[in-house]
């Protein structure tokens, strides 16, 4: 989460440099150029909701009971909204109607770079299992930057819907291999490949989809333009009391 003081934020990708070549004695240094890559824009969106307590309810001494209850419900609705907005990044991660700056979905086998397409998705989609987790861990460890250099990232946490919370626990925490008669260790657990464990997200809509967060320095972001505020005011024409909540942020 990062704060923002503008109408939108932008991330400008820079490719960095390639490997350093051998410098022969007396020869000039070879100079490389960091190239400008893709630009990602995060346009802040306002979310607001309110409710009204009638003049009659106020006069009948129902303010304290109704007001406190509905104010709590309003705060809950604002929190739920943000949870759903962020979760939708993952719910739409395979949906071609929601492509990113590189023209592909968030999870794709064909993210374009200077050295060719790169993938953050298994070549063949697979349900959550010990084998599929091992495959994605290998793929993560082989990740390259835009100049084709290994970046040595590793998995940190597994993010799952509620439907997979028991299966994920068995896979990550079993001492031996899960669902097999083999007397072999659970390599994922023994190697400590998911130090932050499994995180259950109640807002994921696909019961089979699972995601791995790595220790890469850049990833999914939330820019907070305006924190949630709660205000109340009276309406002159009706003598009703109005309550409202407002918040502005962006994700991507």
Place the predicted regions along the sequence by residue.
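Assembly/oligomerization interface modules of large self-assembling protein complexes
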Residues: 1-47
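Long, contiguous amphipathic alpha-helices that act as assembly "spine/axial" helices in icosahedral shell
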Residues: 39-97, 158, 243-245
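Surface-exposed acidic, glycine-flexible loop patches that form ligand/cofactor-binding
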Residues: 95, 99, 146-151
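Sequence/fold signature of self-assembling virion shell proteins
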Residues: 107-145, 152-157, 163-252
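Flexible, active-site-adjacent loop/turn segments at secondary-structure boundaries
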Residues: 40, 45, 56, 104, ...
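Alpha-helical scaffold segments that mediate packing/assembly in large oligomeric complexes
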Residues: 64-66, 76-139
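Short alpha-helical interface patches
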Residues: 27-32, 53-62, 162-166
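Polar low-complexity intrinsically disordered regions enriched in Ser/Thr and small residues
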Residues: 5-7, 19-23, 29, 99, ...
């Amino acid at each position: 989460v990062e704060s923002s003081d503008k109408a939108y934020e932008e991330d400008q990708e820079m490719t960095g440099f390639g490997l350093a070549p051998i410098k022969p004695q007396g020869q000039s240094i070879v100079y490389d150029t960091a190239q400008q890559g893709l630009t990602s824009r995060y346009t802040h969106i306002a979310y607001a909701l309110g409710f009204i307590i009638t003049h009659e309810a106020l006069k009948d001494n129902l303010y304290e009971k109704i007001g406190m209850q509905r104010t709590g419900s309003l705060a809950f609705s604002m929190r739920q909204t943000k949870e759903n907005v962020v979760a939708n990044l993952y719910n739409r991660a395979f949906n071609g109607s929601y492509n990113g700056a590189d023209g592909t979905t968030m999870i794709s086998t064909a993210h374009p770079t200077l050295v060719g397409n790169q993938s953050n998705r298994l070549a063949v989609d697979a349900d959550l299992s010990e084998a599929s987790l091992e495959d994605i861990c290998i793929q993560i460890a082989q990740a390259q930057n835009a100049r084709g250099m290994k970046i040595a990232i590793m998995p940190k946490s597994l993010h799952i819907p509620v439907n997979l919370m028991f299966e994920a626990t068995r896979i990550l925490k079993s001492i031996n291999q899960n669902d097999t008669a083999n007397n072999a260790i659970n390599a994922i657990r023994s190697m400590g490949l998911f130090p932050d464990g499994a995180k259950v997200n109640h807002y994921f809509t696909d019961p089979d989809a699972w995601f791995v967060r790595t220790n890469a320095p850049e990833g999914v972001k939330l820019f907070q333009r305006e924190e949630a505020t709660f205000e109340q005011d009276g309406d002159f024409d009706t003598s009703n009391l109005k309550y409202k909540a407002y918040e502005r942020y962006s994700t991507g």
